[in-house]
């Protein structure tokens, strides 16, 4: 105080300390959480500081990596269990609004009104508990007449006057309810459970909620959900994990999954750690009692304490598949037991290892795009990203009838319809050709 201001008194001392704490909270999200964010104590009693758990640190690091790189924050979060992913996301959004950017509106979209309201209530509680000096930048005096947060004229909008920003809630039951805003951040929760009917489409709700969000730094869109079969959320998850024929990512969203073994409460110390470790190694190929699966958990990162907990918890279930459904170890397992799947998703993933690139990719054309001449003068031409893929060219030295079996899966003719897929399989049971079209 003496060096900078030439004097010292209690008020000046407090001002300097508050400014130091504000800068600390601005550039250290983890400090902001523990020092100022308070969450419900699951064991009862008073609220407790928000100390990030390893799974929440993993999520926060994903957000921070994008923010520090000057990129828009886009994440699709697959939740295996309730570990505080929504809480961490919402507190991070509050950190952006309070500490970094003014007039930065946000929206919370839930599959039901109760789910969106619950997330918002937690948000309002957080804002109410923050100290006033965090809301004002250096040199700006506190305005004691302004509440930290207040209603925004309608029941689904709240305002933070000192930061000139809004928090809005909407539901998937009302696809148009999110329109008319200028949000910069969106938290879409339990997306896999959003209704999908002729009148309700999750894609329309996402468009209503997120289409106005610019692709610029500090903007944020998060899809988070537990799995629920094949739907819009599963399609978006697959897109986030996929690349095109040039190796470019298909989605702007980064996929993030947190397995049960990354949640620290799912751990138990064995009576003899060395004996337990030796048992895992000795029985690593033993399929009886699922010991091979126990060892596999070790290879993917589970701790000895975590595997021991899993082994004991598994005894509460008649079948290991019931355990895997409640506590999935990887994304494949998470989707395997959700919804109504025809094929065993693990077996599908095993078959993917034997996939190979086609020897030809492009298109086929005739003398005319339609009509009888469409099948005359057929020619192949290579094109990256073409819909025609050939894995085995015909061997003209062979004279063999009925060499190929051709199947057709009929789709629709509109751009939004399923594709019609034509597959030709040679008598050797190798897929020789596949193409898809809107016919």
Task: Name each region found by the language model.
Residues 178-180, 196-197, 415-419, 431:
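Extended hydrophobic-aromatic, low-complexity segments
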């Amino acid at each position: 105080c003496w060096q900078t201001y030439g004097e010292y008194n209690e008020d000046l001392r407090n001002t300097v300390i508050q400014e130091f704490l504000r800068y600390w909270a601005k550039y250290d999200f983890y400090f902001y959480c523990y020092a100022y964010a308070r969450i419900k104590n699951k064991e009862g009693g008073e609220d407790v500081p928000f100390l990030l758990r390893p799974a929440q640190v993993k999520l926060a690091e994903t957000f921070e990596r994008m923010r520090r790189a000057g990129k828009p924050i886009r994440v699709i979060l697959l939740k295996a269990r309730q570990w505080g992913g929504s809480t961490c996301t919402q507190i991070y959004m509050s950190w952006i609004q309070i500490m970094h950017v003014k007039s930065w509106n946000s929206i919370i979209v839930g599959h039901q009104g109760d789910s969106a309201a619950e997330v918002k209530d937690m948000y309002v509680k957080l804002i109410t508990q923050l100290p006033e000096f965090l809301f004002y930048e250096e040199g700006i005096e506190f305005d004691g007449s302004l509440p930290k947060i207040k209603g925004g004229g309608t029941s689904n909008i709240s305002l933070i006057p000192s930061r000139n920003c809004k928090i809005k809630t909407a539901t998937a039951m009302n696809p148009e309810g999110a329109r008319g805003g200028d949000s910069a951040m969106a938290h879409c929760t339990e997306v896999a459970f959003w209704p999908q009917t002729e009148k309700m489409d999750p894609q329309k709700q996402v468009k209503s909620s997120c289409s106005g969000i610019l692709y610029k730094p500090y903007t944020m869109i998060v899809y988070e959900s537990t799995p629920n079969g094949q739907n819009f959320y599963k399609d978006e998850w697959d897109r986030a994990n996929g690349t095109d024929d040039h190796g470019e990512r298909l989605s702007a969203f980064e996929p993030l999954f947190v397995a049960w073994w990354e949640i620290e409460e799912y751990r138990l110390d064995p009576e003899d750690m060395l004996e337990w470790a030796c048992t895992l190694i000795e029985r690593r190929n033993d399929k009886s009692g699922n010991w091979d699966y126990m060892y596999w958990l070790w290879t993917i990162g589970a701790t000895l304490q975590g595997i021991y907990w899993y082994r004991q918890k598994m005894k509460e279930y008649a079948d290991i598949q019931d355990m895997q459904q409640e506590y999935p170890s990887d994304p494949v397992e998470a989707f395997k037991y959700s919804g109504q799947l025809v094929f065993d998703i693990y077996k599908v993933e095993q078959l993917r290892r034997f996939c190979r690139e086609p020897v030809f990719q492009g298109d086929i054309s005739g003398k005319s795009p339609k009509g009888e001449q469409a099948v005359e003068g057929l020619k192949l031409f290579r094109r990256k990203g073409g819909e025609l893929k050939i894995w085995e060219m015909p061997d003209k030295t062979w004279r063999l009838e009925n060499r190929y079996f051709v199947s057709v899966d009929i789709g629709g003719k509109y751009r939004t319809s399923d594709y019609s897929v034509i597959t030709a399989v040679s008598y050797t049971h190798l897929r020789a050709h596949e193409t898809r079209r809107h016919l």
